[in-house]
């Protein structure tokens, strides 16, 4: 009996230890059903917990006392945010940066287009992919205005409100509208892109919308937009430098003009969060920690061209590889905002939860840096070869990418 017991097949418990009270394995199909059921239950529980946590977070930030802070900021927005907008008469327009037949005449317009196409021919495919991704992101402006107009106590209720908050949303949107327009015109004139595929991607992205944590909360919303405006300024600025290095000064001027706008918009939203930290530090720093725990998702994360199921991941890999927008940029933005908002110095008015949120945010850049170093070391050890990924935007030509 002893020998028989020692040679019996032992079943394995869910923690991986042998169960000596059972000498027969359960049927494979039963085991598979158990694990699938357990995994589904765990995912459902996790989702319910996340939804409950977000509901509590939104409820806290939409309390009357919190919204009153935003309402009392109206005169401050009038004095410190609205002046960052440029009137239409002073702002650059797309016709200033791409050939304009009305200004050049038929012959001049034709010559300018030939010159544009000649310069565009020298831009590598990888940089074109990044440019299209940036343009698609800009063209989804209807989604972003809709999201901004969900922020309680800081929205345009009628669509033509005279409040400072409402005028800012409309003015910001008017300036942003030129970005996608000018990039779209350049791409059309360059002749290097499958514009129907680009346009389908824009169409699908606007139709898909975007997901944002705690979307009705102005605290979370302004933090998100401050981060994103800096990210787009960096992306367009890096694109300008990259294409200038390949001889396209006209495209560099376009990207530089867009980056300059984004920096003004970043300044506006950064000021708003700065003011919120002064007026309500506990709620604001907790909102900042909440957003960073869930990471700042990119606004075009749902982009889809109808062919590549992993289009955004491939675009992000191209941007990382080309130096257009990298993981280090993400960390750098966080470090900049922590310094600008003096998060480490926050003390007065913080609850215990607020202090924990402050400490979490201040420690996060170093954690991200360590993750970057580990990822770099793993990549060096694996010595992976690049994968050729076709992009429909450039007529399905492949771009060699280092994928995770």
From Swiss-Prot:
Give the primary localization class.
plastid
In terms of InterPro entries, this protein maps to: Fatty_acid_desaturase-2 (IPR005067), Ferritin-like_SF (IPR009078), RNR-like (IPR012348)
**Is Membrane among the key words of this record?**
no
Q: Which domain of life is it from?
A: Eukaryota
What would be one Gene Ontology cellular-component term for the protein? Answer: chloroplast
Q: Carries keyword Transit peptide?
A: yes
> Where does this protein reside within or beyond the cell?
Plastid, Chloroplast
**Cofactor (UniProt):** Fe(2+)
**Positions annotated to bind Fe cation 1:** 138, 176, 179, 262
Q: Which Pfam families match?
A: FA_desaturase_2
Q: Which GO terms describe its biological process?
A: fatty acid biosynthetic process; fatty acid metabolic process
**In the record's cofactor note, how is the cofactor described as bound?**
Binds 2 Fe(2+) ions per subunit.
For binding Fe cation 2, which residues are annotated in this chain's numbering?
A: 176, 229, 262, 265
User: What GO molecular functions are on record for this protein?
Assistant: metal ion binding; stearoyl-[ACP] desaturase activity
> What Enzyme Commission number(s) apply to this enzyme?
1.14.19.-
Transit peptide interval:
1-39
Q: Which family does it belong to?
A: Belongs to the fatty acid desaturase type 2 family.
Physiological role? Introduces a cis double bond in the acyl chain of an acyl-[acyl-carrier protein].
Name of this chain's protein: Acyl-[acyl-carrier-protein] desaturase 7, chloroplastic
Taxonomic source organism: Oryza sativa subsp. japonica (Rice)
Give the source lineage, highest ranks first.
Eukaryota, Viridiplantae, Streptophyta, Embryophyta, Tracheophyta
């Amino acid at each position: 009996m002893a020998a028989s017991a020692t040679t019996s097949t032992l079943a394995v418990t869910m923690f991986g230890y042998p169960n000596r009270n059972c000498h027969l394995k359960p049927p494979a199909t039963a085991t598979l059903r158990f694990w699938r059921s357990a995994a589904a239950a765990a995912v459902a529980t996790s989702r319910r917990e996340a939804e409950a946590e977000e509901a509590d977070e939104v409820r806290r930030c939409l309390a009357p006392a919190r919204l009153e802070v935003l309402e009392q900021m109206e005169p401050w927005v009038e004095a410190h945010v609205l002046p960052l907008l440029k009137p239409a008469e002073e702002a650059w327009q797309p016709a200033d940066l791409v050939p304009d037949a009305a200004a050049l005449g038929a012959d001049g317009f034709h010559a300018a287009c030939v010159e544009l196409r000649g310069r565009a021919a020298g831009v590598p495919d990888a940089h074109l992919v990044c440019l299209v991704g940036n343009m698609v992101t800009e063209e989804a402006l209807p989604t972003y205005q809709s999201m901004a107009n969900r922020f309680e106590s800081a929205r345009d209720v009628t669509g033509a409100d005279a409040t400072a908050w409402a005028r800012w949303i409309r003015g910001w949107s008017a300036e942003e509208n030129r970005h996608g327009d000018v990039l779209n015109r350049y791409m059309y004139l360059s002749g290097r892109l499958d514009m129907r595929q680009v346009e389908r991607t824009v169409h699908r992205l606007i139709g898909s919308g975007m997901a944002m944590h705690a979307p009705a909360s102005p605290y979370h919303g302004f933090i998100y937009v401050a981060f994103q405006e800096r990210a787009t300024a960096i992306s367009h600025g890096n694109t300008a430098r990259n294409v200038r290095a390949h001889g396209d000064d006209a495209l560099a001027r376009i990207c530089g003009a867009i980056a300059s706008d984004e920096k003004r918009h970043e300044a506006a939203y950064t000021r708003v969060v700065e003011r919120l930290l002064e007026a309500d530090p506990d709620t604001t720093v907790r909102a900042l920690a909440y957003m960073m725990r869930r990471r700042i998702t990119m606004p075009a994360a749902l982009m889809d061209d109808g062919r590549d199921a992993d289009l955004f991941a491939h675009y992000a890999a191209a941007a990382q590889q080309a130096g257009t927008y990298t993981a280090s940029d993400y960390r750098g933005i966080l470090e900049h905002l922590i310094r600008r908002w003096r998060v480490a110095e926050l003390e007065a008015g913080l609850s215990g939860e607020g202090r924990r949120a402050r400490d979490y945010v201040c420690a996060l850049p170093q954690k991200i840096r360590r993750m970057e170093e580990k990822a770099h070391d793993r990549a060096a050890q694996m010595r992976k070869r690049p994968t050729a990924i076709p992009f429909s935007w450039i007529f399905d030509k492949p771009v060699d990418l280092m994928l995770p």
